[in-house]
């Protein structure tokens, strides 16, 4: 196995979970940005949320254009951090189904590993209810693909995944989280324009489609934009309180220095 383990930063993990919980009916996807060290450990520092051109319940696809754009973003982060950043993996959600990758997922992963043997895949299974406690659960796994013995098919190999705690939310992950509502809105707009451009639709159907479009946007504002804004406001208030505490501590230390002098 090319990769020994994967370490994902806590704020990048938070973006993945938030993205996975944003859509219950279809799968969502994104790309992981990070680096691979000499011990074959993958370190994921940030993620890029991808826009879906085609919403499907059971699969997702990454276009070459999206992969190219992610590579450019990785180069930008490499220039900022001075570290060898690159696209090291992909993630997608499994709403209401098992966390284990499907045969399509395993084949897709094998295709990516042909370009980079260190490429990894992450899956987040969400909207799953525990039968005993009746509470929701989020399961996640990391995997790679290997060729099965005496077969042309590929099989999954689980890769240990460790979430590295992070006390703060770095700017690059904060930007990804803020980008989520805009991407979801763009997906709805694309779907509406694609349907609205059909010439054979009558007036009643167009009005109905417009109502559905408005309803979906309002649902996104209620489920995604509103909570995200509240979370950002809470973080801002926490930062302000912390700044006041540090300022008070600074003034106290300066006063003690004057006393000693």
Curated annotation (Swiss-Prot):
Keywords: Cell cycle, Cell division, Chromatin regulator, Cytoplasm, Cytoskeleton, DNA damage, DNA repair, Hydrolase, Metal-binding, Metalloprotease, Mitosis, Nucleus, Protease, Ubl conjugation pathway, Zinc. Binds 1 zinc ion per subunit. One of its GO terms (cellular component) is spindle pole. A motif (JAMM motif) lies at residues 92-105. Residues 6-149 form the MPN domain. Its cofactor is Zn(2+). GO terms for biological process: cell division; DNA repair-dependent chromatin remodeling; double-strand break repair; mitotic G2 DNA damage checkpoint signaling; positive regulation of DNA repair; positive regulation of NLRP3 inflammasome complex assembly; protein K63-linked deubiquitination; proteolysis. Zn(2+) binds at residues 92, 94, 105. InterPro entries: BRCC36_C (IPR040749), JAMM/MPN+_dom (IPR000555), JAMM_MPN+_peptidase_M67A (IPR050242), MPN (IPR037518), MPN_BRCC36 (IPR033860). One of its GO terms (molecular function) is metal-dependent deubiquitinase activity. Its EC number is 3.4.19.-. CDD domains: MPN_BRCC36 (cd08068). It is found in: Nucleus; Cytoplasm; Cytoplasm, Cytoskeleton, Spindle pole. Metalloprotease that specifically cleaves 'Lys-63'-linked polyubiquitin chains. Does not have activity toward 'Lys-48'-linked polyubiquitin chains. Component of the BRCA1-A complex, a complex that specifically recognizes 'Lys-63'-linked ubiquitinated histones H2A and H2AX at DNA lesions sites, leading to target the brca1-bard1 heterodimer to sites of DNA damage at double-strand breaks (DSBs). In the BRCA1-A complex, it specifically removes 'Lys-63'-linked ubiquitin on histones H2A and H2AX, antagonizing the rnf8-dependent ubiquitination at double-strand breaks (DSBs). Component of the BRCA1-A complex, at least composed of brca1, bard1, uimc1/rap80, abraxas1, brcc3/brcc36, babam2 and babam1/nba1. In the BRCA1-A complex, interacts directly with ABRAXAS1 and babam2. Component of the BRISC complex, at least composed of ABRAXAS2, brcc3/brcc36, babam2 and babam1/nba1. Within the complex, interacts directly with abraxas2. Both the BRCA1-A complex and the BRISC complex bind polyubiquitin. Belongs to the peptidase M67A family. BRCC36 subfamily. This is Lys-63-specific deubiquitinase BRCC36. It comes from Xenopus laevis (African clawed frog). The lineage of its organism: Eukaryota, Metazoa, Chordata, Craniata, Vertebrata.
């Amino acid at each position: 196995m090319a990769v020994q383990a994967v370490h994902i930063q806590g704020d990048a993990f938070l973006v993945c979970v938030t993205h996975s919980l944003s859509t219950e009916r279809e799968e969502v996807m994104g790309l992981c940005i990070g680096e691979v060290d000499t011990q074959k450990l993958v370190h994921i520092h940030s993620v890029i949320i991808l826009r879906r051109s085609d919403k499907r319940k059971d699969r997702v696809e990454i276009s070459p254009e999206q992969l190219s754009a992610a590579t450019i973003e990785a180069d930008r982060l490499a220039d900022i951090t001075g570290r060898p950043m690159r696209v090291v993996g992909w993630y997608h959600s499994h709403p209401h189904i098992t966390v284990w990758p499907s045969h399509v997922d395993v084949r897709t992963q094998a295709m990516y590993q042909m370009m980079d043997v260190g490429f990894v895949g992450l899956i987040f299974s969400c909207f799953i209810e525990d039968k005993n406690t009746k509470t929701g659960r989020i399961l996640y796994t990391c995997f790679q693909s290997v060729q099965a013995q005496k077969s042309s098919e590929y099989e999954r190999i689980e890769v240990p995944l460790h979430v590295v705690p992070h006390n703060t939310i770095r700017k690059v992950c904060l930007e990804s989280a803020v980008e989520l509502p805009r991407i979801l809105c763009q997906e709805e707009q694309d779907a509406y324009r694609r349907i609205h451009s059909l010439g054979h639709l009558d007036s009643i159907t167009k009005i109905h489609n417009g109502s559905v479009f408005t309803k979906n946007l309002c649902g996104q504002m209620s489920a995604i934009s509103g909570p995200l804004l509240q979370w950002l406001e809470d973080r801002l208030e926490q930062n302000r309180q912390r700044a006041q505490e540090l300022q008070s501590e600074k003034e106290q230390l300066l006063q003690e220095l004057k006393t000693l002098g």
